[in-house]
């Protein structure tokens, strides 16, 4: 069960929590971090290897995003780093670049371990790592649940430079000694807030206990709740913090609108009207339950709209096929839930529709960060019933943004 310490764990949650609470209550949080403000406005100014630069440009990056301008170099210097930035700003490429710069490619042993909260996100990181490291000959493998342990063991035995995975599977393969931690010199927690909210704290702690004493740690997160700050105290040595303040989390480059739909029953007609009005390359529609994913998919197909759908009740193989079709563009509309929001990284997504507003303001950025990725323009449209008005207000307050009513000329925005 997630959140339970695995068998043989030395983790004492009660003691750990009380110790962390004591540290946090001492008001020393600010002194624990040093900030890093050096800015590099071009990838060429970062001192990166030529073949890494080739991979970065081939992937489609032209100019580093705000987090990349400040975050790649300290990671390349071997510093422990805490980096907070919204989804869609290139956090993944930040730590991938830092790892790829520091690997010893002559040593085909695991030198970097990256943990992510979901299979989809782990597999996405694997793809980015492989693409950026294409000219370096990097060997990377994703170890995730729902796949063959034997296949993991075979690939790891043949030698890899980087392992990306979910906490449960990674702990399992380290415990089985299929992944030898002796040469691991970099440890990254991606979407740390999400991993902690899913109850992975114990497993993260247990994995860390098995790693070499001298190791570089990177914590990357869209939000930084108290539990994430706690874990940084436990694992990190004089970390530098690169923080995008909440008033900067404005999801720059994404135009955000709402549509007043009054009643739940009116949403479907509103959605179909939008699709008839707009020329959409690719879009993601978010709803709040798995059952609603299935319901909306049936309704849209019944009205002759081609849509695909994915949610947590589907087996991994089916989800992979659907995501592959969506990435390739053979399917242009994807209906899904928050569960998979962070694993969707499709460059062409120009529109996100919140058919249901998220139940937590924090999830809003994970959803709409799917559009306008890496500086491309994107549009987010929120369907708002009378019951949703409070949540819309909370979202605007949380991100310090004004979400305006959808204008009549919406077709010109896409």
Swiss-Prot record:
Gene3D superfamilies: P-loop containing nucleotide triphosphate hydrolases. Residues 72-242 form the Helicase ATP-binding domain. The keyword Manganese does not apply. Residues 253-414 form the Helicase C-terminal domain. Disulfide bonds: none annotated. GO terms for molecular function: ATP binding; ATP hydrolysis activity; RNA binding; RNA helicase activity; translation initiation factor activity. It catalyses: ATP + H2O = ADP + phosphate + H(+). GO terms for biological process: cytoplasmic translational initiation. ATP binds at residues 85-92. Pfam families: DEAD, Helicase_C. A motif (Q motif) lies at residues 41-69. Signal peptide: none annotated. GO terms for cellular component: cytoplasmic stress granule. It is an enzyme of class 3 (hydrolase). Its EC number is 3.6.4.13. Keywords: ATP-binding, Helicase, Hydrolase, Initiation factor, Nucleotide-binding, Protein biosynthesis, RNA-binding. A motif (DEAD box) lies at residues 190-193. SUPFAM superfamilies: P-loop containing nucleoside triphosphate hydrolases. ATP-dependent RNA helicase which is a subunit of the eIF4F complex involved in cap recognition and is required for mRNA binding to ribosome. In the current model of translation initiation, eIF4A unwinds RNA secondary structures in the 5'-UTR of mRNAs which is necessary to allow efficient binding of the small ribosomal subunit, and subsequent scanning for the initiator codon. eIF4F is a multi-subunit complex, the composition of which varies with external and internal environmental conditions. It is composed of at least EIF4A, EIF4E and EIF4G. Belongs to the DEAD box helicase family. eIF4A subfamily. This is Eukaryotic initiation factor 4A. The lineage of its organism: Eukaryota, Viridiplantae, Streptophyta, Embryophyta, Tracheophyta.
């Amino acid at each position: 069960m997630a959140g339970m310490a695995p068998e043989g764990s030395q983790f004492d949650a009660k003691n750990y929590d009380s110790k962390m609470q004591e540290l946090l209550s001492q008001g020393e949080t600010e002194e624990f971090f040093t900030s890093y403000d050096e800015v590099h406005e071009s990838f060429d100014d970062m001192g990166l290897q030529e073949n890494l630069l080739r991979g970065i440009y081939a992937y489609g990056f032209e100019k580093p995003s705000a987090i990349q301008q400040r975050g790649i170099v300290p990671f390349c210097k071997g510093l422990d780093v805490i980096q907070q930035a919204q989804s869609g700003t290139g956090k993944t490429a930040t730590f991938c670049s830092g790892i790829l710069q520091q690997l010893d490619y002559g040593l085909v042993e695991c030198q970097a371990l990256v943990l992510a909260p979901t299979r989809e996100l782990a597999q996405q990181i694997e793809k980015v790592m492989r693409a950026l490291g294409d000219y370096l000959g990097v060997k990377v493998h994703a170890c995730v649940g729902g796949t063959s342990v034997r296949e993991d063991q075979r690939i790891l035995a043949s030698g890899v430079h980087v392992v990306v995975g979910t906490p449960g599977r990674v702990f399992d393969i380290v415990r089985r000694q299929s992944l030898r931690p002796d040469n691991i010199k970099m440890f990254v927690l991606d979407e740390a807030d999400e991993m902690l909210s899913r109850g992975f704290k114990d497993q993260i702690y247990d994995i860390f206990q098995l790693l070499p004493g001298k190791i570089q740690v990177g914590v990357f997160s869209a939000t930084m709740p108290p539990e994430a700050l706690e874990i940084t105290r436990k694992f990190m040595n004089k970390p530098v913090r690169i923080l995008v303040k909440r008033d900067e989390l404005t999801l720059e480059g994404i135009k955000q609108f709402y549509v007043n739909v009054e009643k739940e029953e009116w949403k479907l007609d509103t959605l179909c009207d939008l699709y008839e009005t707009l020329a959409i390359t690719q879009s993601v529609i978010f709803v709040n339950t798995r059952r609603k994913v299935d319901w909306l998919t049936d309704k849209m197909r019944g009205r002759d709209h081609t849509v695909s759908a994915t949610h947590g009740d589907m087996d991994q193989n089916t989800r992979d096929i659907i995501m592959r079709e969506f990435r390739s563009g053979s399917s242009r509309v994807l209906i899904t839930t928050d569960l998979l929001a962070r694993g969707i990284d499709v460059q062409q997504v120009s529109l996100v529709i919140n058919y249901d507003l998220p139940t937590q303001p924090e999830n809003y950025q994970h959803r709409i960060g799917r559009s306008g990725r890496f500086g491309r323009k994107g549009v987010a449209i929120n369907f708002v019933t009378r019951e949703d008005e409070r949540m819309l207000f909370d979202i605007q307050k949380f991100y310090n943004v004004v979400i305006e009513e959808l204008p009549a000329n919406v077709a010109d925005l896409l």
